[in-house]
Amino acid sequence: ITVAGVTPTGYNGTFNCTVTTSTNFTYALSGSLAAGTGGVYTPEDVSELVAMATTFFAQGSGLSCYVLELGAGNATDGATALQAYITANPNSNYVAGATGYFYAYLVPRTWDGNATFLAMLASYESTTAKTYFFITTTLATYTSYTNLMKCAFTLIESPSFGVYSANALTAATYSGGFVTATTTTSHGVVPGNWFTIAGCTPAGYNGTFLALAGTTGNTLVYAVSSNPGAETILGTLVANLYANSAIPSTEFSIASAFYRLLQYNPSASNRVAPFAFGYVFGVTPFPTRGNNALLTTLKAANTNIIGTGAEGGISNTIILWGTTEDGHDFTYWYSVDWVQINSDEMISNAIINGSNNPQNPLYYDQNGINRLQAVEQVVMNNAIAFGLALAPVTVTATPFATYVSQNPTDYPAGIYRGLAVSYTPQRGFIQIVFYVNVTSFPAAG
């Protein structure tokens, strides 16, 4: 929640709260304050929706999007409601011009790592699902997503880092989902900073965490998903050498990538560019200084960040690395979906028109198969021209006589399963290795 307008002003700010009754909530503050008067609160979802829209439209004004209201509740309630909505409106039922079907969903931050949401993602891992989720994850939770989740595009927003030295722990205890750790000396971490603990046993105390309210002096408070058990070896607060400010409250970084997806409109003059390294605007780049190992880990986990084009002498912010959780550039699955959707539409169009053309009806015979094969070849030729498929692509068809001999019950039912295509989606470069050989001996001219 965000609290504003309270006197004294120390009550104001944005906080994690605990709802205690239908009319009361609590939140943590450091120090003591006189009784407060006045003020208003704004639920997180209100400011988050505004931030989503602000970042989305910072990319341009040529697109619109829907806001799908799922009702009041927590992340579990929201994921359950969304699953019910998609089940009632599956993208497999979509036909051209239909409404209420959505290709991708930009979900709230609070859904990150939620067990119900993760279970829902498992329902959309098939190659024919054609449904995607843009998810803001964190340094503490990005490992919740697996490389089977081709439906998930995850991104970590630029985190808040402080500057602090390595500091040995003297205690670590767990209670009710939270760890309280004590450092040898004052650590310099403040609530809202991210920090790393290493070297503890059990390992559940280790990781990168968000400092919560109550972090001060030589005390660190952070959340963990389960009880690690009693500590037997105490580790260390890992040093951080470079400070970094968190994103502003008006930013929802992954909304920029969401816009980039929605602006795809494939044609021969508007080819589909790779998702990786795409320009995005109004977003904060992830800090790079001192984070080489972390950035390598995130890339290997197929977790995206906002970067810059500095390596190429370009000041724009860009998407790194543009992949879904299975490691494919988003355009890979966009291509697969485009081929499925357009093949269905164009073949259906040919069959329907063929049933309404007395001069040239479409029959289930060799000529009819040839005509459908030609229709599908046009689809694949367009995929090449639009930047979605690597040339060449050839559509094959089992000859009529062979097919009906091998599948005798299909002809009476009007079923033909003999069309096929194998192709490779088009993609861009990710890394170039360039070899330079330097010598002191000039070559003979």
Residue positions per predicted region:
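Surface-exposed assembly/interface segments
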Residues: T2-G5, F15, T42-V163, G188, ...
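Small/polar beta-strand repeat architecture
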Residues: A4-E44, Y164-W194, A198-L241
